[in-house]
UniProtKB/Swiss-Prot annotation:
Coiled-coil residues: none
Chief subcellular location: cytoplasm
Protein name: Imidazole glycerol phosphate synthase subunit HisF
Known role: IGPS catalyzes the conversion of PRFAR and glutamine to IGP, AICAR and glutamate. The HisF subunit catalyzes the cyclization activity that produces IGP and AICAR from PRFAR using the ammonia provided by the HisH subunit.
Active site: 11, 130
Protein's GO biological process: L-histidine biosynthetic process
Pathway(s) served: Amino-acid biosynthesis; L-histidine biosynthesis; L-histidine from 5-phospho-alpha-D-ribose 1-diphosphate: step 5/9
Amino acid sequence: MLAKRIIPCLDVKNGRVVKGVQFEELRDAGSILEQAKFYNDELADELVFLDISASIESRRTTLEEVLKVSEQVFIPLTVGGGINSVERAREAFLHGADKVSVNTSAVKEPTLISELAERFGSQAVVVAIDIKNVGSHYEVFTHSGKTPTGLDTLEWAHKVVELGAGEILLTSMDRDGTQKGYDNVILKEISTSVGVPVIASGGAGNLQHLYEGFSIGMADAALAASIFHFRQHSVREAKAFLQEKGIAIRL
């Protein structure tokens, strides 16, 4: 059995880590570099760096900050936000990214997924999918959750894998920042059907929620921000808890 992963997420805006609720009401969560170093020392399995306003503002990811982080951490680093071409992905890799995450750009131009996979390998391509429960189904949203696409989540998840995505980062906008737990219904549906690793995101508020993301949602990795940024729990504490619960995890 492959070990499950704990992945802190740095949502970055204007050179600072921020955290909101349902993609709104952003509050400061500290220095990018200090948080990155902290998670490296805490033995996080990976780190995600998302420039959350890059796509909205139609600009590149803040690569100078990515480089600073990559020079200080020794765990895999995924970079997203404004990655809308092979060239921009290449720049991210040159600045220290191990993987790139695409979201809005993949919906606009799905062939970008294939181009990235062919150039850099599927293992380096993460497709982030931001979703909302709209009653009859879960719909995909883009531009940091501001634009509905009409796409069905399950159909889009299968499509991105067909195109070459090596991993899916699935974020429930309904749960984001609420600390009420992951949406394990759609998480399980995606995790058990797509054939690539799925990262649970949106809603982790305690260690039990992480456990449920693995045991009920069947996720391969759990991404969290609030509970770690504001030191409600540590990554080490989370891993010890999960191991006690019988989850295969790297300590």
